[in-house]
Amino acid sequence: MAIRYVFGRAGRGKSYFVLEEIKKRLEGEGHHKLFLLVPEQFTLQAERDLIGKQALKGIMRAEVLSFTRLTHYVFNEVGGITKIPINEIGKNMILRKIADESSKDLSIYKSIAKQEGFITKLNDLICEMKQHDITPIELTMEFNEMEEDTLLKRKLNDIILLYQKFNNYLRDRYVDNEDNVNLLIENIEKVQFLEGAEVWIDGFQSFTPQIFRVIEKLAEKVKNLTITFTMELKSKESDQDLFHINRKTYLKIKSIAQRLGLEEEIIDLDRNERPVLPKVQEICHIEKELYAYPYQQYTGEITHLDVFSGSNLYTEMENVAAQIIHLVRDKGYRWKDIALVSAGLEEYSMILKRVFEEYSIPYFMDEKRSIMNNPIVELILSSIGILARGYQYEDVFRFLKTGFGDLNKDEVEELENYVLQYGIKGKDYAVPFTKGFTNKKHEEIEQEESDEIHEEKIKYNEFRERFIAPFLKFEKKIYRKKKVGHITKALFEFMKDLNIEAKLDQWIEELREKKYFEYVNENTQIWNKVMEILDQLTEILAEESTTLKEYGRILEAGFLACEVGVIPTTIDQVLVGSIERSKSHDIKALFVIGVNDGILPSSREDGGILLDHERESLDKKGLSIGNTLENALLEEQFTIYSALSKPTEYLWISYALADQEGKAQRQSILIDRIKKLFRNLNIQSDVVPTLNRQLHLITTPISTFKYMTESIRQNIDDKPMEDIWWDVYQWYSNESQWDERRNLMVKGLFHENQISYIGEQKARSLYEHPIKSSVSRLERFANCPFSHFVTYGLRPKERKEYQLSNPDIGRLFHDSMENFTKELVNEQIQWKDLTREQSDYFVEKVIDEMVPEFEHGIMLSTHRYQYLVTRLKRISKRAMWTLTEHIKKGQFVPMGHEIIFGLEGDIPPIVIELESGEKIYLEGRIDRVDILNDEDGNYVKIIDYKSGSKEFSLSDVYYGFQIQLLVYLDAVLSSQSQKYQAEVHPGGIFYFKIDDPMVKTTEKAVKEVEKEINKRLKMKGLVLKDVNIIKKIDEDIGRSSSILPASLTKEGEISKTSSALPEEDFKALLKHVRGLVKEIGEEMLKGNVKIEPFKKGGDTSCKYCAYISICQFDHSFHENQYKTIKELKNEEVLEKIRKENENI
């Protein structure tokens, strides 16, 4: 028995040496077995290399194995497995069950144990402990020796509990991979197939203590054992850190060999010149000097190394793709000669796929893919969630949107709209839908029901029945059955009822037809993977009792542990992979992307269950778990060294200056190191696009089209453009298949994103006749004509959701005010006679009556909304009593509430005649009108209730943004003048905020607090500049009013700070507003649909506009500019309006 050590730096041909030896043995006379042991993820490539490189006729005696596969070989011969094997999926599910059951006994991990990812970390830690031969007993002994109540001690307490329970659960029944290795160690000496065998171990940097024991047993059993080490036999002082882990591994193996008394042989490939693949000087220099201190600098010409700096991730990938095309097209490379690796592949993945497809580069992404986002997994977890959480919206539509239910995509979207609008959830699915199909008393609409409503009702209930039918069967099967086995069986039958397997096959066929072979490969495995998980779940937890919620968490833990590997669909393609994981065949060119600070080398996060310093603390006490931060950094350093030394002819290293969100990124220290190693290195970049760089991007028709478009756009914007792009444009012009796309491009380049007018004919066809307009419609047009066009011309409908919006709350306030007034009329109570107790009683009464019917009972649907009802009552009580006190303090009396003016209203509309003779009828609803009839004349006061803050601005009135109160005043003045056959005068126009403000107090008297509240509820607006009228609105005015925005001087005159206007200015304002309405009406009927929002200071009309995604207003377009509004002072407004009247 002998052991051989094969030494050599990266690229010295160690693997080639091993394969060559195996070839010689196969060609020789012997009949003994030959085994090549490699890491699990490299077995496929090693098999290919063994078959392909050696040109052998047969390899029956030689096999490529991982240590896991070796375990299976041993057990197949000697037996020994009397327990049920469980994989990582099964372990995760068991640990989830244990963690949930142990929640009360945990201290540090009580809440953390419920988080996604904890179980995976716990499983990893237990695996490490088993691999390092650390048992719960050893941990307990260490725990007992700890004196201080440290965080580590409390962590160990939880870990010991979970670890022990896990082992107890497995004992006598199950065996995991780590226990299998222990069984392997016990059984190696019994097997016959290893008698006289030769074993080569290649591709490892280090081993766990468990695997060291396996190697020890192999060394005792086999004829020859050969192990390769990527390191120099006598490393230079400068390379000590680089080969530190490899050297430790070698010394450990050597000590085993010496203890066994094996014959040792050293093969040093660094000294023995061998016919390995020659490499270019630049790659050789990197291999020798990357981590050498001191280092030698390369001073020659650099032709086989490029370092590139991209503006962002996308341009970095575009330049990578262009260079790959260059190598294949101009240098004669095959796709398979090229590999691309990254330490941040997740961030690049989607960009890479898109760019490579644009450039028609065939590629294979070597990665394990989580199945968590697969539709079948989504279907299973959402189905369990539906029953566990009682048909909640998220679970129901997570299920339906998988596409494997009995509703098609359009039906799902229709049902979702209905469910969101009426708040369908829980038990609502168990009975026929009636919301939206009943009258206000929730009685079925029968004979009066329209055919359309009846059909809608039938349709939605058919959707409901098709969705819920399989769930009712599922629910019935698990009713009162709590065992995991019963639920799993019912789940399988549920999937069978849905015909999932056949639907999956059909979907895979559709993917195949669309040539999405990558997804075909992935989804072909998914059904078997799911069945494997359900089988494992039944095998290990069948008799365990659980709840549906816990069952879902256990199943999710299993799915989280499951990944699928994808097999390459063809050999000739670019290999894409993680720098840590990928093991490629011999390659000529390597692209290393994402070489940014924190990515390569990575900024290792101490995110495990045990932190690095805690591992070190245990290591000092003899409990070595191995995976310290220092080891991880050394391993990564070795990985970088191995990767950069891999190609034979060309190396590309690149990084991005900004991430996908545009945040700046720094280059890696690795870039600085490469720059130091190569004196003449010139880092290329696309930040300033040179002619050569642009020429480099002219590759394939699809990818080049985009660059051409960007360049011509620059030319249009008066920026410099290289003439080569006109030649490129000419090429596309000569290719007829590009005509449609080229024409669209030209149209897009000269797109102005502006349509001023659609014409009178179209405008008249869009808007109803006669034109009846609300004030808010006119204000919207003044804000932006395009917003008006979309709202009142196109009339899109927003998806209605079962939730209260601010307008809904405002409507509730308004309705309650109206109903309050009706109660007073019914009870024949005058406002001036109303008491506080009566006011509060009527508020309670009207709101209690309104709430059950308001928006389909939404106010009673949740505790949050029920609390809102209480708050609304409090605010309404305060508002009603404040308004009552206002009336009591003055001589104005309410003439009416919710007064409608319009063609069919309580009072006539305002009629505006346009130049064409056509008329616009202004209509609206006035919250409250008060009137004063005395010897001085008739005066009216307009009050509009607002649930939010609303400041009155004469400047906004002037521009047409706030004409509501003046239009209301105009309508009432006109109607009352006709009624009294005499002039009626404006008394005031006001906003009243419905609120119950909180007042900070330091034991103030109740009267003082009330006074402060009334001050805050003071109305805002304009009052007639007449002391007599002001006093008739507020008889208690004194120096300052608590009702309206007015105050008096010592002499009893109206102060300058008062918001008051003489009657002639009121009339001038009314005239100005009528002029605005006419102007807006003229523009509306001309078809003005300009995208022209206003900008006033820092405020714009786009701020709360729902249509910004439709108009796509962008002020970088010359035609998209804000209509800048200057804020005018009150006197400026009045001066302008007076001048208007003078000019008429």
Curated annotation (Swiss-Prot):
Say which domain of life the source belongs to: Bacteria
Positions that bind ATP? G8, R9, A10, G11, R12, G13, K14, S15
Give the cofactor note: Binds 1 [4Fe-4S] cluster.
Q: Which cofactor does it need?
A: Mg(2+); [4Fe-4S] cluster
The EC number on file is 3.1.-.-
Keywords noted in UniProt: 4Fe-4S, ATP-binding, DNA damage, DNA repair, DNA-binding, Exonuclease, Helicase, Hydrolase, Iron, Iron-sulfur, Metal-binding, Nuclease, Nucleotide-binding
What PROSITE patterns has UniProt attached to this entry? Answer: UVRD_HELICASE_ATP_BIND, UVRD_HELICASE_CTER
Q: Which residues form the UvrD-like helicase C-terminal domain?
A: 274-584
Q: Where is the UvrD-like helicase ATP-binding domain?
A: 1-276
**One GO term of the biological process aspect:** double-strand break repair via homologous recombination
List positions binding [4Fe-4S] cluster.
C784, C1102, C1105, C1111
- InterPro entries assigned: ADDB_N, DNA_helicase_suAddB, DNA_helicase_UvrD-like_C, P-loop_NTPase, PDDEXK-like_dom_sf, PDDEXK_AddAB-type, Restrct_endonuc-II-like
Annotated GO MF terms: 4 iron, 4 sulfur cluster binding; 5'-3' exonuclease activity; ATP binding; double-stranded DNA binding; helicase activity; metal ion binding
One Pfam family name is PDDEXK_1
Partners and quaternary state? Heterodimer of AddA and AddB.
Tell me more from the record: Despite having conserved helicase domains, this subunit does not have helicase activity.
Function according to Swiss-Prot or TrEMBL: The heterodimer acts as both an ATP-dependent DNA helicase and an ATP-dependent, dual-direction single-stranded exonuclease. Recognizes the chi site generating a DNA molecule suitable for the initiation of homologous recombination. The AddB subunit has 5' -> 3' nuclease activity but not helicase activity.
Would you identify the family this protein belongs to, as annotated?
Answer: Belongs to the helicase family. AddB/RexB type 1 subfamily.
Which NCBIfam families has this protein been placed in?
Answer: addB_Gpos
Q: What name has this protein been given in UniProt?
A: ATP-dependent helicase/deoxyribonuclease subunit B
- Gene, per the UniProt record: addB
